[in-house]
A protein has these predicted regions:
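Membrane-interface motif at the C-terminal end of an N-terminal transmembrane signal
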Residues: 10-16
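Structural alpha-helical segments in enzyme catalytic/regulatory domains
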Residues: 304-306, 384-388
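Boundary at the C-terminal end of the N-terminal hydrophobic targeting segment
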Residues: 16, 20-22
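Divalent metal-binding segments
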Residues: 3-6, 10, 22-36, 41, ...
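His/Asp/Glu-enriched, well-ordered alpha-helical/loop segment
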Residues: 331, 336, 340, 345-368, ...
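Residues that cap or delimit alpha-helices
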Residues: 499-501
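Glycine- and charge-enriched low-complexity intrinsically disordered segments
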Residues: 522-525
């Protein structure tokens, strides 16, 4: 199939058919595409805004104004003044966990009222065979709804399929059909459809045991990538899961040796609608004489940065494991390593350990990463920068409290490498627009101030999620709309740079292009 010539102004983005069954292709085949009459924010070093961009053979062949002339054999897309940005790069999330959820997984990160959530689930039920589960597990929070709660049992009973919702914040809710299904398998569910205590882990474990197959995993993996394509993400850097050989009760656990299989299958079939970069999480214990049983095997038997433009391995993270000895092994192997920090003591220790290793084995060229950093004073930024370490920030829409960081404004004035990540998939949201909302306004999804004076402008926020993330992906040909770069772009449904703050949360893609392929379109005729 091929793209067509014009975008219909005012088209509504449809999320009803969120996860379709895998079709023959997940993308429209690459063709020469000329985008004209737009406001194309290139995010190049000069922050140029141009009206035209030509994609040929999957890469930008021309970018500017009046560049096309009488070019032949090109499909022209009239943007009619729409805003275009480079494809969003989420430089640290857990998309692979989302792609391995049981049931007919249905994201709800784009709805903000209980009524809209129920409408979404009811629409989804039309695609789901009778008696099969609709699930929403992970990237959803009570905070995102104006009611500040999850749907209750009576509300979910409007959906004529079993429903299971497990939120990053707000607990777990089911409807009567889902409640009866789990209770028949020995899982205790409250009269209100809530699950608490040990029963919560047992519920998820039971769903995984009974509902997951290679085919359902593949369906969900494709659906997850398609969903976030509709939100403008063109590159995901996945940062792993906690290892579990058997179906696990924990939301952040999976078999880390097989969980990539559905994504690899999509890659083999050329159905990936987004680029994937895969890091490997390890947790070998830091003992006096560690054997590093899993990390040593990974470093010995895997290749870093191996693959193609659609799927490629990366490094070790979001945990390196093995303490200082693990860091030494990673440095000796020449791999990238990443750990997260949740407080000042944690990030201080991470930097101290890296200084110890760097004194023995230089790491300054390995682009090591520390993520999250809610507390990160200038002195630590100086020390991290001296080691060649970059920091990933985001991770905030569901947080509460005053001045809980990260210190975005300080970082923008510092030489240290910085980029955007959501960390979404299990404990927070992936939706970039919810994360951007917090970075720009300084408020969480409940409208509570959490950043003090550390919030950023819209231009700065977009830069973190596009051009700045080249360094973290270790690729120079994504993240900006420039000649020679991969043809990744997003046509937005509204102008990101001028809409009211509250509308930021509702931003969507009308058209998402990856490598010249149309991976999402709404309104192309």
């Amino acid at each position: 199939m091929s793209g067509a010539a014009a975008i219909a102004v005012g088209g509504k983005l449809g999320f009803a058919k969120t996860y379709a069954e895998p079709q023959q292709t997940a993308t429209t085949a690459a063709a020469d595409l000329a985008f004209i009459n737009g406001r194309i924010h290139t995010m190049d070093s000069n922050n140029r805004i141009v009206s035209q961009a030509l994609i040929r053979n999957g890469r930008f062949a021309a970018v500017g104004d009046n560049i096309l002339g009488q070019a032949a054999n090109v499909k022209r897309v009239n943007l009619m003044g729409k805003t275009v940005i480079p494809g969003i790069i989420d430089a640290h999330n857990h998309i692979v966990l989302v792609g391995n959820r049981p049931g007919w997984h249905t994201p709800l990160e784009h709805v903000f009222t209980i009524a809209d959530a129920i409408a979404q689930l009811k629409s989804r039920s039309a695609e789901v065979p009778r008696g099969e589960f609709i699930t929403t597990i992970g990237p959803i929070s009570a905070m995102q709804f104006v009611e500040r709660r999850l749907p209750n049992l009576s509300e979910l009973d409007a959906v004529d399929r079993p429903v299971y919702i497990q939120a990053a914040q707000g607990g777990t809710r089911m409807n009567s059909a889902g409640k009866a299904w789990l209770e028949a398998r020995g899982v205790m569910v409250g009269a209100d459809g809530a699950i608490t205590g040990p029963a919560l882990g047992l519920a998820l474990q039971t769903l995984r045991k009974e509902l997951l197959t290679p085919d359902t995993r593949k369906r969900t993996a494709l659906g997850a990538l398609q969903y976030y394509s509709r939100l403008g993400i063109t590159t995901h850097r996945d940062c792993g899961a906690f290892q579990a050989d058997d179906p696990a009760p924990g939301i952040a656990s999976e078999n880390t040796y097989t969980m990539h299989n559905p994504f690899l299958a999509l890659h083999r079939e050329e159905k990936l609608p987004a680029r994937m970069r895969i890091d490997f999480l390890h947790q070998d214990p830091p003992t006096a004489n560690p054997s590093l049983p899993t990390l040593s095997q990974r470093l010995r038997n895997s290749f870093p940065f191996f693959g193609d433009d659609w799927m490629r391995t990366g490094g070790i993270g979001e945990f390196t494991g093995g303490g200082v000895e693990g860091l030494r092994a990673i440095a000796k192997a020449g791999w990238r390593g990443e750990d997260h920090a949740l407080n000042l003591a944690g990030v201080t220790n991470l930097i101290k350990d890296r200084e110890t290793v760097n004194a023995e084995i230089p790491i300054t060229q390995l682009r090591w990463i520390i993520s999250h950093i809610p507390e990160f004073p200038v002195e630590l930024a100086n020390r991290a920068n001296a080691l060649g370490i970059g920091v990933l920030v985001g991770w905030g829409p569901l947080r509460t409290g005053m001045n809980v960081g990260p210190p975005y404004r300080m970082l923008m004035g510092h030489a240290i490498k910085k980029g955007y990540h959501s960390d979404g998939g299990d404990i927070t949201v992936i939706n970039p627009w919810l994360n951007f909302y917090t970075i720009i306004t300084g408020q969480n999804l409940a409208g509570q101030p959490i950043l003090g004076e550390q919030n950023l402008t819209r231009q700065e926020t977009l830069w973190l999620a596009t051009a700045a993330n080249k360094w973290f992906i270790w690729e120079n040909d994504i993240g900006s709309i420039e000649v020679g770069n991969h043809g990744d772009l997003v046509v937005l449904d509204r102008d990101y740079f001028s809409v009211p703050d509250e509308d930021l949360k509702r931003m969507r893609s009308l058209v998402t292009i990856v490598g010249g392929k149309v991976v999402h379109n709404d309104g192309i005729v």
